[in-house]
Amino acid sequence: MKRVVTLVSKEQAEVGHRFRVFSVPDECKSCRLFSVCLGRLTPGRSYKVVEVRPSMGQRCKITDSEMVPVVVEEAPIVGLLPLNKALEGVVVTYEDECAGCEGCPNDVVKKGEKVKVVKILGRKKCRNKEFAIVEFFVVSAPSHAVLDSSKTAQAPSRAPSSRRPLK
């Protein structure tokens, strides 16, 4: 899994500590440390600290706490997928089929994103449908066609604008 160096509070700087980034406060975006702190992480994703590096004395502009450089890797998301998509090692398109069911990951995964199933944990029934409870990672963003499905793309015509009879 991809590893990223970022900053966390001294209290979180412990190997094995897991955390989730819910959103990025506006105050962070103007901070000089943003690009090496929350700017490297994706809101909605969970991370696990795998290495702690020596502190360089940076302080958080919001909490005024000491920030410590750490290496994190994205932790898998646990959620529901239809049984026909729940195969370990397979990359599938998330289509939000479980919307409205408890355990549906639509708060952290967008419709159209490609996800890689890493582990099947069990089964769950919701609205008379069977789902698999799985661990997965998001591997790519949704395609433009899914993001903007209200507009239909049409390829330009290759036919000549007027046909004249051949002589």
Curated annotation (Swiss-Prot):
Record-linked InterPro entries: UPF0179 (IPR005369)
Domain of life: Archaea
UniProt-listed Pfam families: UPF0179 (PF03684)
Entries under HAMAP family matching the protein: UPF0179 (MF_00498)
Family (UniProt): Belongs to the UPF0179 family.
Protein name as it appears in the record: UPF0179 protein Pars_2336
UniProt source species: Pyrobaculum arsenaticum (strain DSM 13514 / JCM 11321 / PZ6)
